[in-house]
């Protein structure tokens, strides 16, 4: 098991070499610090506690401050342990390089809060009949039909009723990593993930153990823009541009044509 703590930045879209548009979520994964190592002998299970995002020392209580001192790091804001993650030492840094494009991950976060909601929005119940006796004062169309059996004399635990919707721990499984940017500490994940922008998330290796997918080949936007500029120049010199030609192959031909043109001008 491996994992890392991150922060949701937002959603965008990218393109593959075949022109397919893919919606992705950008997750900022600044280097995490191993703040505690849990073992079976001492704790009854093994896990690795990670911490990320700096926090003012005056806002940290003494037990946590002592824990950070042992790890030889500064106080952190977001602390979570990942069970089954082993092989790391106290104070060691964990960054985005532990993942690669094509891997499947499970992402856990706090879902967006939506306030008080009725049973139709909260539990996806059906709207009642709007005619033939339904929709009257005694039978509103959006009200739950029944709260239970007449003989029970109570409402059983777990009955779907109106209440607060969202703002709860949510996990989405088997999300594909499209790109890993170790320079900017970013992960691009295919699809949406729980939580609002700037909310913290836990990214873990997928527990279902599905096979890793082949990495999606993304279009290089800089290369495409540069190639378009070179093609326009090549047209002026009647240079033949073939399918699959790269800017590295086309650029020398254009330079050669420009030098020949300059030499003819000097004559």
Curated annotation (Swiss-Prot):
GO CC terms of this entry: cytosolic large ribosomal subunit
Gene Ontology biological-process annotations: translation
Disulfide bonds: none
GO molecular function: rRNA binding; structural constituent of ribosome
Gene3D superfamilies documented for this protein: 3.30.160.810, Translation factors (2.40.30.10)
Record's keyword terms, sorted: Ribonucleoprotein, Ribosomal protein, RNA-binding, rRNA-binding
UniProt key word Magnesium: no
Region (Disordered): 124-147
Keyword Kinase: no
Family statement: Belongs to the universal ribosomal protein uL3 family.
Function text: One of the primary rRNA binding proteins, it binds directly near the 3'-end of the 23S rRNA, where it nucleates assembly of the 50S subunit.
PANTHER family recorded: 50S RIBOSOMAL PROTEIN L3, LARGE RIBOSOMAL SUBUNIT PROTEIN UL3C
Oligomer status and interactors: Part of the 50S ribosomal subunit. Forms a cluster with proteins L14 and L19.
Protein name: Large ribosomal subunit protein uL3
Organism: Mycoplasmopsis agalactiae (strain NCTC 10123 / CIP 59.7 / PG2)
